[in-house]
Amino acid sequence: MKSGRFIGVMSGTSLDGVDVVLATIDEHRVAQLASLSWPIPVSLKQAVLDICQGQQLTLSQFGQLDTQLGRLFADAVNALLKEQNLQARDIVAIGCHGQTVWHEPTGVAPHTLQIGDNNQIVARTGITVVGDFRRRDIALGGQGAPLVPAFHHALLAHPTERRMVLNIGGIANLSLLIPGQPVGGYDTGPGNMLMDAWIWRQAGKPYDKDAEWARAGKVILPLLQNMLCDPYFSQPAPKSTGREYFNYGWLERHLRHFPGVDPRDVQATLAELTAVTISEQVLLSGGCERLMVCGGGSRNPLLMARLAALLPGTEVTTTDAVGISGDDMEALAFAWLAWRTLAGLPGNLPSVTGASQETVLGAIFPANP
């Protein structure tokens, strides 16, 4: 069974940077050693946003974007190796999620698409890469997401305490770690995605630092109620979503009925939308004693305060409190999934994704001996 140093690479729907994590992994433990966040050039970020919102592009443009993202991921890995004074031979493999540009797990031909050419990563780092983690689960009738609940269960489940892990990235997803029950998990809806999109369009800022804009505004209740009527929120699990659904166009369609509103009030309303949709799903799933939050949203003081207020009797904390950096959780999970793939172990949970069976995930891109 492969064990040793693994690297996880994650570029999520928030597009706030490439997260790279170095960890030692074996069948008994996962020990994080180092991490860094690598910037995404504005031009690449905009290209990804455009494709996620349905903008047409040529096959040549698509191929170039795939290559450019692969090179970006390789640069991020090499930066971490240099920082840690490590060589390619010191790493067993890289687990690279890729950049999701479309996720449509239902319909006549369900599919999901993550780009960032793994061949570029192998060629530029000299390290074996495991990627394309989601499509095997979809081929077996699953949603292909979320995949991180299996990792949450391995690291954070408790024999007696009802726990849930909440990742607030661009999309928010919940892992249900309830003693005596199968692991559950699904996307609750927008996390930071709509908040980030709004402040970017209105103020040219990548995100609402410390929720300053949202805290300066007031929740527009009719707008909130209008958005809460979206059918996704009442759809039963298993379910997953992404930027191709909850994007700026989605927000604009709701704002048409509310002309002339204060932009800060919209920001406050979007923060409340995220908090309410998450808390409702926690309660619908039977509640928990401890909600451990990770992802960029765990740094949003307004979101954390609203979750605590909406979930009385639940201890709302970050995963940092149990020794796992909330910023690195997903990248660490894909390092772990790469280890499982190389070990021939399943990486999905049918109770989460709805797949017909457990399966080994991903494709292996071997480095030269």
From Swiss-Prot:
<comment type="pathway">
    <text>Cell wall biogenesis; peptidoglycan recycling.</text>
</comment>
<dbReference type="GO" id="GO:0016301">
    <property type="term" value="F:kinase activity"/>
</dbReference>
<keyword id="KW-0808">Transferase</keyword>
<comment type="pathway">
    <text>Amino-sugar metabolism; 1,6-anhydro-N-acetylmuramate degradation.</text>
</comment>
<dbReference type="GO" id="GO:0016773">
    <property type="term" value="F:phosphotransferase activity, alcohol group as acceptor"/>
</dbReference>
<comment type="similarity">
    <text>Belongs to the anhydro-N-acetylmuramic acid kinase family.</text>
</comment>
<dbReference type="InterPro" id="IPR005338">
    <property type="entry name" value="Anhydro_N_Ac-Mur_kinase"/>
</dbReference>
<dbReference type="GO" id="GO:0006040">
    <property type="term" value="P:amino sugar metabolic process"/>
</dbReference>
<keyword id="KW-0418">Kinase</keyword>
<protein>
    <recommendedName>
        <fullName>Anhydro-N-acetylmuramic acid kinase</fullName>
        <ecNumber>2.7.1.170</ecNumber>
    </recommendedName>
</protein>
<keyword id="KW-0119">Carbohydrate metabolism</keyword>
<dbReference type="GO" id="GO:0097175">
    <property type="term" value="P:1,6-anhydro-N-acetyl-beta-muramic acid catabolic process"/>
</dbReference>
<dbReference type="InterPro" id="IPR043129">
    <property type="entry name" value="ATPase_NBD"/>
</dbReference>
<comment type="function">
    <text>Catalyzes the specific phosphorylation of 1,6-anhydro-N-acetylmuramic acid (anhMurNAc) with the simultaneous cleavage of the 1,6-anhydro ring, generating MurNAc-6-P. Is required for the utilization of anhMurNAc either imported from the medium or derived from its own cell wall murein, and thus plays a role in cell wall recycling.</text>
</comment>
<dbReference type="Pfam" id="PF03702">
    <property type="entry name" value="AnmK"/>
</dbReference>
<feature type="binding site">
    <location>
        <begin position="12"/>
        <end position="19"/>
    </location>
    <ligand>
        <name>ATP</name>
    </ligand>
</feature>
<keyword id="KW-0067">ATP-binding</keyword>
<dbReference type="GO" id="GO:0005524">
    <property type="term" value="F:ATP binding"/>
</dbReference>
<dbReference type="GO" id="GO:0009254">
    <property type="term" value="P:peptidoglycan turnover"/>
</dbReference>
<keyword id="KW-0547">Nucleotide-binding</keyword>
